């Protein structure tokens, strides 16, 4: 009988090689010891190329070095054999007993299986979604939300101390456009007809907010609307200058009442956003207001620091940041000639604020259209004497919806978009969360609505959840306490399918760490699909409630462990694990 099963075989084997290097006086080489999973089972369960890394500094043949290092594994109780292959690969073969006992370790660990201390408590802030509160969240925001929430969960499982943050863009021009759009619809309800700018916000939600204001205040905010279009050239044209003119006039006409309209639409949209995300299973520790950076003087302070460092210059009355010195294609304005700070200026202040809060690393999750923004933000960090390497950017490509094989059109300003809420109502939260992370975040995602709604094995989320439900059904038929399976004798798990399933369970903790290290929660989704596939094959070819008690309990322990891993993985992705389907 071998000792209690090692939860992390790779760490165990890494320690063996690290000790071997120390004994040989080679610790100073500080080499990365990595174990890979061979593509062919005939090459073992783990393979290491350390001998080839040592060949040059030791001036020896890799195979000779590998032969020497292989002797260090003789004391491991988890290895059946060690082979040297090719130019000097060290291939390790786990004992059948080590694999068999792993299902018991999974059951003992429960919901903590797959968690590790890799992050060692490192403080990481993950900022994601951060959509302008100018309308309902749409399906593009949904992908960023699903990715960000899943990544934060994965990082936490890997031992990092994670803070989830939403940056509220409540100080920008887009909020003024929404306030203007709502006021114009409000005027219509008061019998004041006017040309509605084609580049204002067109959605029905704007009319809904106007109705709420009208219901509460009737005609209180009808202030000389006939003057709204005064001195606004081409007010009916689709030009930004015309829109700015209307906003300026609205502020003058409404006076202090403009703040009410502005704050009302902000609070309405922000409240809707919070509720929408909560229903999507996405929550935040901090909601950070952009306006607070202006109110506290943070934006002015950040610009002042850049000016002190000689990173700004004046041109045409505006202040420019020398971002081209940091790899940007051109310099960027931080303060316009009229004294107003740009969005870039508040973004600099926001990142300065982030690092002042003591995070070891900051992860920004942006839409892929912000790719060009990376160099200027990192440049500003460097100019402020902050380490730009501690700021990491994960880009998320837009999700394109397809219904009946046809692309669904999207335009936020024109009010032509599918909201995240509508998507959830159509396909369900589980399907949406899972489909959003099926691919790497920076890859385009075609979201097939018909597939997401189907109850077939072609639907990946259904396929994975059905595997979980099948295990629940087997255990329910058994009728005993699953807790007793923790002590089951698993030596009867000798079939090829069983050993393959056990190896798949062994791979789960490594998959979680890889997903955390590479910012790739899609690795969890891939893993779950593969695990479900192996389980379904095993289920279709195996009887579980057999008369022989040892075999029965061993198989039940195995599938119970599969259920636990499916549950744990789905939880990281924000997807439920139903007991019945």
Curated annotation (Swiss-Prot):
Annotated SUPFAM superfamilies: Anticodon-binding domain of a subclass of class I aminoacyl-tRNA synthetases (SSF47323), Arginyl-tRNA synthetase (ArgRS), N-terminal 'additional' domain (SSF55190), Nucleotidylyl transferase (SSF52374)
PANTHER family assigned to the protein according to its UniProt record, in alphabetical order: ARGININE--TRNA LIGASE, CYTOPLASMIC, ARGINYL-TRNA SYNTHETASE
A Pfam family recorded for this sequence: DALR_1
Primary location recorded for the protein, binned into one broad class: cytoplasm
Statement: the UniProt record of this protein carries the keyword RNA-binding: no
Motif ('HIGH' region): 131-141
Protein name: Arginine--tRNA ligase
GO molecular function, one term: ATP binding
HAMAP family on file: Arg_tRNA_synth (MF_00123)
Similarity annotation: Belongs to the class-I aminoacyl-tRNA synthetase family.
Gene that encodes the chain: argS
Any GO BP annotation: arginyl-tRNA aminoacylation
Keyword Aminoacyl-tRNA synthetase annotated: yes
InterPro entries: aa-tRNA-synth_I_CS, Arg-tRNA-ligase, Arg-tRNA-synth_N, Arg-tRNA-synth_N_sf, ArgRS_core, DALR_anticod-bd, Rossmann-like_a/b/a_fold, tRNAsynth_Ia_anticodon-bd
Keywords, comma-separated and alphabetical: Aminoacyl-tRNA synthetase, ATP-binding, Cytoplasm, Ligase, Nucleotide-binding, Protein biosynthesis
GO cellular component: cytoplasm
EC number: 6.1.1.19
Class in the EC hierarchy, top level: ligase
Reactions performed catalytically: tRNA(Arg) + L-arginine + ATP = L-arginyl-tRNA(Arg) + AMP + diphosphate
Organism: Nitrosospira multiformis (strain ATCC 25196 / NCIMB 11849 / C 71)
Gene3D superfamilies according to UniProt: Arginyl tRNA synthetase N-terminal domain, HUPs, Isoleucyl-tRNA Synthetase, Domain 1
Subunit structure, as described in the record: Monomer.
């Amino acid at each position: 009988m071998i000792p209690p099963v090692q939860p992390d075989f790779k760490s165990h084997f890494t320690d063996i090689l690290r000790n071997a290097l120390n004994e040989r006086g080679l610790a100073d080489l500080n080499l990365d010891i990595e174990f890979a999973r061979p593509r062919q089972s005939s090459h073992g369960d783990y393979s290491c190329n350390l001998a080839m890394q040592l060949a040059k500094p030791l001036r020896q043949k890799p195979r000779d070095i590998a032969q020497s290092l292989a002797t260090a594994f003789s004391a491991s109780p988890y290895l059946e054999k060690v082979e040297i292959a090719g130019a000097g690969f060290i291939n390790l073969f786990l004992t059948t007993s080590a694999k068999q006992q792993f299902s018991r370790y999974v059951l003992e660990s429960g919901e903590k299986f797959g968690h590790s201390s890799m992050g060692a408590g490192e403080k990481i802030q993950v900022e994601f979604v951060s959509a302008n509160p100018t309308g309902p969240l749409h399906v593009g925001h949904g992908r960023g939300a699903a990715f960000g929430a899943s990544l934060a969960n994965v990082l936490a499982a890997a031992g990092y101390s994670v803070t989830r943050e939403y940056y509220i863009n409540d100080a920008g021009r887009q909020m003024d456009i929404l306030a203007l759009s709502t006021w114009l619809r409000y005027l219509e309800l008061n019998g004041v007809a006017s040309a509605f700018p084609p580049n204002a916000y067109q959605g029905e939600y704007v009319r809904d907010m106007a109705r709420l204001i009208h219901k509460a205040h009737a005609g209180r905010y009808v202030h000389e609307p006939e003057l709204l279009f005064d001195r606004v050239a081409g007010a009916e044209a689709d030009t930004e200058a015309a829109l700015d003119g209307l906003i300026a006039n609205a502020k003058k006409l409404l006076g202090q009442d403009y703040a009410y309209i502005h704050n009302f639409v902000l609070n309405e949209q922000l409240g809707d956003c919070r509720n929408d995300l909560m229903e999507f299973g996405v929550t935040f520790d901090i909601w950070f207001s952009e306006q607070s950076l202006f109110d506290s003087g943070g934006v002015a302070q950040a610009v002042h620091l850049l000016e002190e460092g000689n990173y700004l210059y004046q041109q045409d009355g505006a202040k420019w940041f020398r971002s081209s010195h940091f790899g940007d294609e051109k310099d960027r304005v931080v303060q316009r000639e009229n004294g107003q700070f740009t969005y870039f200026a508040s973004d600099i202040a926001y990142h300065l604020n982030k690092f002042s809060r003591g995070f070891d690393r900051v992860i920004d999750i942006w839409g892929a259209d912000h790719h060009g923004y990376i160099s200027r933000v990192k440049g500003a960090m460097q100019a402020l004497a902050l380490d730009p390497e501690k700021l990491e950017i994960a880009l998320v490509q837009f999700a394109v919806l397809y219904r009946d094989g046809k692309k669904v059109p999207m335009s936020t300003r024109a009010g032509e978009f599918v909201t995240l809420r509508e998507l959830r109502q159509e396909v369900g939260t589980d399907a949406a969360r899972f489909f959003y992370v099926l691919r790497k975040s920076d890859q385009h995602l075609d979201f097939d609505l018909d597939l997401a709604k189907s109850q077939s094995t072609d639907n990946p989320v259904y396929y994975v959840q059905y595997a979980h439900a099948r295990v629940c059904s087997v255990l329910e038929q058994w009728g005993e306490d699953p807790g007793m399976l923790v002590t089951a004798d698993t030596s009867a798990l000798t079939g090829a399918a069983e050993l393959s399933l056990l190896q798949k369970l062994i791979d789960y903790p490594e998959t979680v760490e890889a997903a955390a290290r590479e910012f790739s929660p899609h690795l969890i989704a891939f893993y779950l699909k593969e695990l479900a596939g192996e389980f379904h094959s095993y289920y279709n070819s195996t009887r579980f409630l057999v008369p022989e008690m040892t075999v029965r309990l061993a198989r039940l322990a195995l599938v119970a462990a599969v259920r636990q891993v499916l549950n744990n993985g789905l939880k990281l992705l924000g997807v439920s694990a139903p007991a019945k389907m």
